[in-house]
Amino acid sequence: MASSTLLITLLISLSAFFLRMVLAQVPATCASRLLSLAPCGPFVQGFAQLPAQPCCDSLNQIYSQEATCLCLFLNNTSTLSPAFPINQTLALQLPPLCNIPANSSTCSSSFPGEAPSDSSSVAPPPSSSTGSQISQGAKNNSRVAATPVAQMAPRPTSFMGLGYGLKSSGSKSEIQLTIFALAAILPAALLLI
């Protein structure tokens, strides 16, 4: 019993360590907000046809509280890819599917920790809680073109959405393998309790 408790403690500690390593790449103000997008995982990894309602709720909350974090998620999906592989084409479909007036043209190509280069590039959050219109691109802004949406198949090399088997080199693949191992061992360890 003591050994299983020690094993569980070790696994949780290692999981937290690797999660902190991944989130260290994300600005501090966005890290906790982006964690709330976990319900979007099945959709942005190609395992679900539509995003779940908790995903849309979290996305809307991020958009209304910190739109730059939504921009970070949409423009820099590779930031979270070691632990949370994201298909950027699918991620860009989230705002219209969740009735959020943001799309790929909403954010300029900002980088982690950097605000968008144009103050008009982030649409203001909706002022009322009544249903918002789906944004299909720019309407009255001739300098911004609508972005076409392409349907992509899920990545065949992704195993259970953990990125196991992705072509990678160095410590990134080691982190992916470690996270995969933790995800495989943790449920079995919890059954021992």
From Swiss-Prot:
Annotated membrane-spanning segments are none
Which keywords are on file for this protein? Cell membrane, Disulfide bond, Glycoprotein, GPI-anchor, Lipoprotein, Membrane, Signal
Quick one: where is this thing mainly located?
A: membrane
| Gene Ontology CC entries for this record | plasma membrane; side of membrane
Q: How does it sit in the membrane?
A: Lipid-anchor; GPI-anchor
Q: Where is the composition biased (Low complexity)?
A: 116-132
Lipid-modified residues, GPI-anchor amidated serine kind: 168
Residue positions assigned to the propeptide:
169-193
Q: Glycosylation annotated at which residues?
A: 76, 87, 103, 140
Q: Where is this region: Disordered?
A: 109-140
Q: Sorted alphabetically, which Pfam families does this protein's record hold?
A: LTP_2
| Residues annotated as signal peptide | 1-24
Looking up Gene3D superfamilies in the UniProt record yields: Plant lipid-transfer and hydrophobic proteins
Instruction: List cystine links.
Output: 30-71, 40-55, 56-98, 69-107
- Which subcellular locations apply to this protein? Cell membrane
CDD domains from the entry? AAI_LTSS
The job of this chain, per UniProt, is described as: Probable lipid transfer protein.
Annotated family: Belongs to the plant LTP family.
What the entry lists under PANTHER family is as follows: BIFUNCTIONAL INHIBITOR/LIPID-TRANSFER PROTEIN/SEED STORAGE 2S ALBUMIN SUPERFAMILY PROTEIN-RELATED (PTHR33044)
The identity of this protein, by name, is Non-specific lipid transfer protein GPI-anchored 10
Organism, by scientific name, is Arabidopsis thaliana
